[in-house]
């Protein structure tokens, strides 16, 4: 089954009354750290919790970068794993550990996130990595949206920009279940409608080559 994403509030119009674009913007602008960050869930970031990571959990994230990546490709692989690990740790305390990849399969289930939730949280996880000096080859980018009902359902994801080449890579944590590595691939390939095969395991980060 192909998993398409559009925010829960597009599936359920009554949720529009609870979705606040200004809130999402504020969440995306926060300077997240392991000691303090806001986590959103419920579809369209209708629920927000102020959280902090346990030191032991953050130590596991930092351990992924204990050997300094040799290049941007290797760093993207570490980023993908770090996003999955952060999702796992946060899921244990927020009740989102059962989040199913995609929107439709888990729609209406407790703890399910849509792509607005995922892209917002992933952006803030990326800021944590940056703020702790773990990103040497990338900057945290803006969220990007594809689809707009013209060539597919709207879908939003986080991004990073490679410092050397200035190439933008999507960091998409929505396709797979909670705790799985994020998909990282070039912006244009993602905008062209890339999606994983429904039966395939999570892919390693893809480069421009």
Residue ranges of each PLM-predicted region?
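Acidic/histidine-rich, surface-exposed loop or edge segments in extracytoplasmic proteins
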Residues: 40-73, 96-108
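Post-signal/leader-peptide non-cytosolic segments of secretory proteins
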Residues: 27-30, 51-56, 63, 170-177, ...
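Hydrophobic/aromatic-rich core segments of domains that either
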Residues: 127-190
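Short N-terminal segments immediately surrounding and downstream of signal-peptide cleavage
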Residues: 20-43
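Low-complexity, Gly/Ser/Thr/Pro-rich intrinsically disordered linker/tail segments
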Residues: 191-209
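Bacterial N-terminal signal peptides that target proteins for export
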Residues: 1-6
């Amino acid at each position: 089954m192909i998993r398409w994403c559009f925010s829960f509030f597009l599936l359920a119009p009554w949720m529009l009354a609870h979705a606040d674009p200004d809130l999402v913007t504020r969440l995306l602008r926060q300077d997240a750290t392991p000691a303090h960050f806001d986590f959103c869930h419920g579809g369209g970031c209708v629920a927000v919790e102020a959280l902090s990571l346990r030191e032991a959990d953050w130590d596991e994230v930092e351990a992924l970068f204990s050997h300094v990546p040799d290049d941007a490709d290797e760093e993207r692989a570490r980023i993908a794993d770090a996003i999955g690990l952060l999702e796992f740790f946060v899921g244990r305390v927020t009740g989102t550990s059962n989040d199913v990849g995609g929107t439709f399969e888990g729609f209406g289930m407790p703890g399910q996130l849509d792509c607005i939730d995922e892209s917002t949280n992933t952006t803030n996880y990326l800021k944590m990595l940056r703020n702790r000096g773990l990103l040497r080859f990338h900057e945290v980018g803006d969220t990007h949206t594809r689809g707009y009902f013209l060539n597919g359902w709207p879908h939003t994801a986080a991004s990073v920009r490679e410092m050397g080449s200035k190439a933008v890579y999507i960091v998409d944590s929505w396709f797979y279940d909670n705790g799985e590595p994020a998909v990282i691939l070039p912006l244009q390939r993602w905008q062209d409608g890339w999606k994983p095969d429904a039966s395939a395991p999570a892919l390693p980060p893809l480069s421009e080559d």
